Swiss-Prot record:
EC number: 3.2.2.9
GO terms for MF: adenosylhomocysteine nucleosidase activity; methylthioadenosine nucleosidase activity
Binding residue positions for substrate: G78, I152, M173, E174
Protein's recorded name: 5'-methylthioadenosine/S-adenosylhomocysteine nucleosidase
Provenance organism: Mannheimia succiniciproducens (strain KCTC 0769BP / MBEL55E)
HAMAP family noted in UniProt: Salvage_MtnN
Pathway listed: Amino-acid biosynthesis; L-methionine biosynthesis via salvage pathway; S-methyl-5-thio-alpha-D-ribose 1-phosphate from S-methyl-5'-thioadenosine (hydrolase route): step 1/2
Similarity comment: Belongs to the PNP/UDP phosphorylase family. MtnN subfamily.
Catalytic residue positions: E12 (proton acceptor), D197 (proton donor)
Length: 229
């Protein structure tokens, strides 16, 4: 099995890249794909860049060039669900775009034409992620992760997301785009992210301060999952 891993930022992939043996590096369409072995497992690791379009371009390149059997999305997220704090783990059961709206034509909020209302994560990968999180002693929540091309820092924007998606667990900027590409290519996926901020008025400062913690926690989760894939 070849395992695809997607992260947006250098900080979100460098721990994994530094663990990789027999590494080859491919630069394509503004993205970087590292291929090699991590703890004996065949891995293709993508640094996509930030945002939905970058994530979609990178994930498409990853699937076309490296042809992984599954995709794991790693990185950081803003916690929305009650009880989440910096370093906690969120696992997707489904993803949606919080900034897509074609409801005038009868679609659900966040749904794009020719797409499902949400992109459902692979049940086996979701269960494995929860198992690994519990084994590593993390506080973990599974649920809906919402994506959009905005860094959410509280205020009206966060309030609107909560109103549109009452069961939202976390927000970030790539997961739904990655999920949509995996849906089209019929590749199983799951999103596993560590909380870097609370999506509130202090989110910008919190993100800068706690991104290294989130990157370490999410990378540890991926390493734990690799051991069992």
């Amino acid at each position: 099995m070849k395992i695809g891993i997607v992260g947006a930022m250098k900080q979100e992939v460098e721990i994994l890249a530094n663990l990789m043996r027999n590494q080859t590096v491919t630069q394509v369409a503004g993205c970087t794909i590292y291929e090699g072995l991590i703890n004996g497992k065949q891995v293709a690791l993508l640094q996509s860049g930030i945002g939905k379009v970058a994530a979609a371009i990178g994930t498409t390149a990853l699937l076309q060039l490296a042809k992984p059997d599954v995709v794991l999305n790693t990185g950081s997220a803003g916690g929305v669900a009650d009880g989440l704090k910096v370093g906690d783990i969120v696992i997707s059961t489904e993803t949606a775009y919080h900034d897509a709206d074609v409801t005038a034509f009868g679609y659900a909020k966040g749904q794009l034409p020719a797409c499902p209302a949400t992109f459902i994560s692979d049940e086996k990968l979701t269960a494995l992620a929860k198992q690994v999180a519990q084994a590593q002693g993390h506080n973990v929540k599974r649920g809906l992760i919402c994506s959009g091309d905005s860094f959410i820092a509280g205020g009206e924007r966060l309030a609107q997301i909560k109103a549109d998606f009452p069961n939202v667990t976390a927000v970030e900027m790539e997961a739904a785009a990655i999920a949509q590409v995996c849906h089209v290519f019929r590749v199983p996926f799951v999103v596993v992210r560590a909380i870097s901020d609370a999506g509130d008025g202090q989110a910008g400062m919190s993100f800068e301060e706690f991104l290294p913690i989130a990157a370490k926690q999410s990378s540890a989760m991926i390493i734990g999952m690799l051991e069992q894939l």
